[in-house]
Curated annotation (Swiss-Prot):
The keyword NAD belongs to this UniProt entry's keyword annotation: yes
Family: Belongs to the Gfo/Idh/MocA family.
Listed name of the protein: Inositol 2-dehydrogenase 2
EC number(s) given by UniProt: 1.1.1.18
Job of this protein: Involved in the oxidation of myo-inositol (MI) to 2-keto-myo-inositol (2KMI or 2-inosose).
SUPFAM superfamilies for this protein: Glyceraldehyde-3-phosphate dehydrogenase-like, C-terminal domain, NAD(P)-binding Rossmann-fold domains
Top EC class for this record: oxidoreductase
PANTHER family: BINDING ROSSMANN FOLD OXIDOREDUCTASE, PUTATIVE (AFU_ORTHOLOGUE AFUA_2G10240)-RELATED, NAD(P)-BINDING ROSSMANN-FOLD SUPERFAMILY PROTEIN-RELATED
Taxonomic source organism: Paenarthrobacter aurescens (strain TC1)
Recorded name of the encoding gene: iolG2
InterPro entries to which the protein is assigned, alphabetical: Gfo/Idh/MocA-like_OxRdtase_C, Gfo/Idh/MocA-like_OxRdtase_N, MI/DCI_dehydrogenase, NAD(P)-bd_dom_sf
Keywords: NAD, Oxidoreductase
Reactions this protein catalyses: myo-inositol + NAD(+) = scyllo-inosose + NADH + H(+)
């Protein structure tokens, strides 16, 4: 019997998850879709799935074995807690919650469930952990193929920031991927951070300083830099280079399409992140479904990973509001 999945949120990410679960993920069936826009839910859902505008109805439905939360960031914590009350496994898109207080509430509830049952119900959608490029990079780093890592350089550029994006949201919604992946990559927690603004692009809305430049230092002493540019116009790019004692290792732009025509050679850059991380999303979903079907603990990021990223984000926001002062990350 397939795992019957209910998906909350039928926007860009939710629709992609529905499509993957319905076409490329083995052992899954989308049986219920919830979105505040009933028309959008109907457009994204497979023909046999039920539709609702009430996520609580979906979570408590006898037609649902597991839930994917792909709705607005502000809804994540509340919906995850509802899934806990229903004792339903849930895969929540990042971030765990937009505020530290909400993250702490979810982690505490998750800990209670683990204490009572021996297993967590929560998986968190930090999909880069399943990207083949990042996986290979991590294997090289942790295998010390080029000796000790010394520095890491990251670049994350988007064509255009979403409406209403602020400098704080740029950290909690976009940079949050690097705040999670760097300690995962290096096997060492982030201990201090700093944030600086670049020269302001004319395309940034009020409240957003763009581009920005961040630093993260991990407990092993490695320094990571991150350039975050949300209004780069030309498309989506993510880069990561690890500088080690005996060489460098970097991600390849595997999603670029090469075109040779009329005496020219071109590389077509994707408009957003989805083509670049399509494999990561599929692999993450399959790992989650396979674990649920086998009665095993999913290998995805969990509640504590989400809290750790939130704590680093909080320190980064504090640096943002303190003229770029280097700020310690407190895990206590």
């Amino acid at each position: 019997m397939p795992i019957r999945v209910g998906v909350i949120g039928a926007g860009v990410m939710g629709a992609d998850h529905i499509r993957n679960l319905s076409t490329t993920i083995g052992g899954a069936k989308v049986t219920f879709v919830a979105d505040l826009d009933a028309g959008r839910a109907a457009a994204a859902a497979p023909p046999s799935a039920r539709i609702t505008t009430d996520p609580t109805e979906l979570i408590n439905s006898s037609d649902v074995d597991a839930v994917v939360v792909a709705s607005h960031d502000s809804t994540h914590a509340g919906l995850v807690l509802e899934c806990f009350e229903a004792m339903t496994p849930v895969l929540c898109e990042k971030p765990l919650a937009p505020t530290l207080l909400e993250s702490l509430e979810v982690v505490a509830a998750d800990a209670d469930i683990v204490a009572a049952t021996g297993a967590s119900l929560l998986s968190l959608g930090f999909m880069r952990r399943f990207d083949p490029g990042y996986v290979a990079l991590r294997q090289a780093v942790q295998g010390r193929v080029q000796g000790e890592p010394l520095m890491v350089h990251c670049v994350s550029r988007n064509a255009a920031a979403g409406p209403g994006t602020t400098s704080e949201l740029a950290i909690t919604n976009s940079a949050i991927h690097e705040l999670d992946i760097i300690p995962w990559l290096l096997g060492s927690p982030v201990t201090e951070v700093s944030w600086q603004a670049g020269k302001q692009t004319s395309r940034a809305e009020p409240g957003l300083q763009d581009p920005s430049f961040m630093t993260l230092r991990t407990a092993d002493g490695t320094l990571t830099t991150l350039e975050l540019y949300l209004n780069a116009q030309y498309g989506y790019t993510t880069r990561c280079e690890v500088v080690s004692e005996q060489g460098t290792t970097s991600l390849q732009e595997s999603s670029l399409l090469g075109i040779e025509q009329d005496g020219t050679r071109q590389a077509v850059i994707p408009a957003d992140w989805r083509p670049r991380f399509a494999d990561a999303y599929r692999l993450q979903l399959q790992a989650w479904i396979s674990a649920l079907a086998g009665g095993e603990a999913p290998s995805l990021a969990g509640a504590q990973d989400g809290l750790n990223a939130s704590l680093v984000a909080q320190a980064m926001i504090q640096s943002l509001h303190s003229d770029g002062t280097t700020t310690k990350v407190s895990y206590s």
